[in-house]
Amino acid sequence: MKHLRAPLQSRVVQWLVSPGASVGANEVVVILEAMKMEHEIRAPSAMRITELLFAPGDVVQDNEVLCLCEPAAAVAALPEDSGHSKAAAQTHDAAPVRADLERLLARAALTQDASRPEAVAKRHTLGLRTARENLADLCDANTFIEYGALAVAAQRSRRSQEDLERHTPADGMVTGIGRVNEQPVVAMAYDATVLAGTQGMRNHQKTDRMLGLALQNKLPVVLFAEGGGGRPGDVDMPIVAGLHVGTFASFARLNGQVPVVGIAAGRCFAGNAALLGCCDVIIATRDSNIGMGGPAMVEGGGLGVFKPEQIGPSSVQQANGVIDVLVDDEAQAVAVARQYLSYFQGPRTDVVAPPENALREVVPQNRLRVYDARDAMQGVADVGSLLHLRSGFGVGIHTALARVGGRPVGLLANNPLHLGGAIDAPAADKAARFMQLCNAHGLPLISLVDTPGFMVGPDTEATAQVRHVSRMFVAAAHLRVPYLSVVMRKGYGLGAMAMTAGGFHSPLFTAAWPTAEFGAMGLEGAVRLGFRKELDAVPDGPQRQALFEELLARQVDNGSAIHMATTLEIDAVIDPAQTRHWLITGLQSAKVAPLSGVASIDTW
């Protein structure tokens, strides 16, 4: 019979059996202490204890016999997974909750919405959701793990611990990691029901922790940014102004490295708005207000007295380009955020192609008739995959994320409904930033061209047009992603070159529809400028107009898509119905070049 031996040098703390007792296999016989930690020594098999060789307090050596035993086959063995004692053989459901766990559960419950019904009801009365409701909707079911849930406001010197636990849960910032579309994402939400969603010292620490994890592990970030900025009431920290806080620099450092999504509902002012402005994309509800200072700051600066809803309403912030996607409510904002992230989570196989022949009808037969270029975007993108960005700003160029043949891409298209498709400063800014966004995150770009060129004239030059439109050339020159161009109708001058990444031979291909026409400048202007002498020689009236029409017809023919293809200035003239085939083949042929250094995306 093998006697029970000590597995290490230790001290006997307690015998759980007496001589003559029978024990089952895996039952605890004695407690030993070593290095201030207690070890349970179990019976290797069913046995009867005949003699205890050491008393409590005695020191035993490694492998020394602790007690004499003899076989006791009739003693039932405890199952291996029975727990640490006979008492633990009870089922987990029946076992009482330990005191330490009970304290944790009670404390954790205070962080949940159920513990604050009045605050939740007030939120719902405003037509808004709580921070936790938004995060639960954003993340796949049961995937969110929360960091820093037990934090409270740094106000212990002026408020009781119980008060802080009940009224400043998570210090007004819910942070963690969850999965969106089955891929990990850092998710953070300011809690507007806690101190108006202001930025406290503890929630800055929590934010910094999550931003570090996002950067280190290359995780996308979603921020619900509602709140009132800095919090002066945190008095536990021995600081004066708090301008050393690293949150803003850490958040900005994510730019171009991971997708960063900002969501605004309700009031988003000051520091909260500064973080929102660093995001790749801003999704905002119609009732939102976004501004670098709320009413108190505006009034304090002697700038007047305003209500919150008068500062940065969505109608202003969408038109000026601050808001990328305007939605009705937070539920729609979350749905858009999930859709936006999906473009950076790889290709899809559940592709539904739009009707091919529909593209043949997009451009009117009358070359002077305007049309909606978004129909062309709809015609090349997989069904249901279009997400337009900044649709209320820079309306001269449409920008959208989409999929073509399952591959995520960025789409640009001139808008003939605005200035005939001419590119003005806002449109150029919008297009250049969109190129940077797609380039940073590896999305190929597809350009649908119909432009008479850059907008000109004294009023236009007053907008710094020269600088703004040149952004398109600079952004395109630094692209590492494939660029594919299709000229639908007008391809004139420098504007057409800017829409084709700097020139018709810069893209992977520049194809044209039969409706396309080309020239170094607008054809009408080219005739008036190049044939001024001939036109002036003819009397003003029907005769001069007839000559003008004749000369214009020659220019249109000379600048036709077919003629351009014969001189190899473009790569092909294609049936519009074959556009998706060309794009899909091109996307399959081209590679995304490795990123050299860190990409950046302008905030504007």
Where are these regions (language model features)?
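Short, solvent-exposed beta-edge and connector elements
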Residues: A6-V12, M35, I41-R48, V65
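Exposed loop and linker-edge segments at protein-protein interfaces
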Residues: L16, S22, E51-F54, V59
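Short hydrophobic beta/alpha edge segments that flank linear recognition/processing sites
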Residues: A21-R42, Q61-A77
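Acidic, low-complexity mobile loops and tails
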Residues: M1-I31
